[in-house]
Amino acid sequence: TEFGIRINTELSIAGGTRYVKADYQFQQYWPLSKRYTFAVNTEFGYGKGLGGKSFPLLKNYFGGGLGSVRGFEQGTLGGVSPSSIAPTDRAQDIRVGGNRSLLLNSELIAPFPGVGNDRTLRMFAFVDVGNVYCTASTTVNCASNALRASSGFGISWLSPVGPLRLAYTTPIKKEVTDRTQKIQFQIGTAF
């Protein structure tokens, strides 16, 4: 069994931007046999403006996509600001994320068929649950607070430049305004 915990805190009290931001991440891998592994990733994030200041938009959390809730377009979960160019066209909304996030990923990892003992090419099945939350304002419409969920399968290759992942996804809990993707590709991280 391998596990890791990451805790990060930011505090800004100087200048015109005053805020606190805290992140927590926990990952654990359980070998089920020599060939199969079950993995879990949990993340929580919280940000708040201090001294009457708003939480900075550039520090917002963004959810959706590989590395988050797969099956949703990258960075589309959370608050939206209606486009000033086409205010009635929901497809033109600007995604602004939110100051709170929740994410749970679970994966069953297995060797790719026909590769023998090569552990660099693997396949996985997954279920993801999560969302990004915001505080509504006159310029930001916070999307539904309901958790989003997806499932799917994919392949990963531990290449010389880092992990490459390709996933086929199906959102299983979504809202009408959510932007979804069936196929997603990622370079970089395990989840």
What residues fall within each predicted segment?
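C-terminal outer-membrane beta-barrel translocator/porin domains of Gram-negative envelope proteins
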Residues: 1-121, 125-129, 133-136, 142, ...
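Exposed loop/turn and edge beta-strand positions of beta-sandwich/beta-sheet ligand-binding modules
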Residues: 20, 149, 181
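Membrane-spanning beta-strand positions in outer-membrane beta-barrel proteins
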Residues: 37, 163-165
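Short amphipathic alpha-helical surface patches that serve as generic macromolecular interface elements
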Residues: 103, 148-152, 163, 184
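Active-site scaffold segments
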Residues: 124, 152-158, 165-167
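A short alpha/beta connector and helix-capping loop motif
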Residues: 138-155
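Outer-membrane beta-barrel "beta-signal"
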Residues: 155-162, 180-191
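A short, acidic, flexible beta-alpha connecting loop/helix-capping segment that sits on the rim
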Residues: 170-174
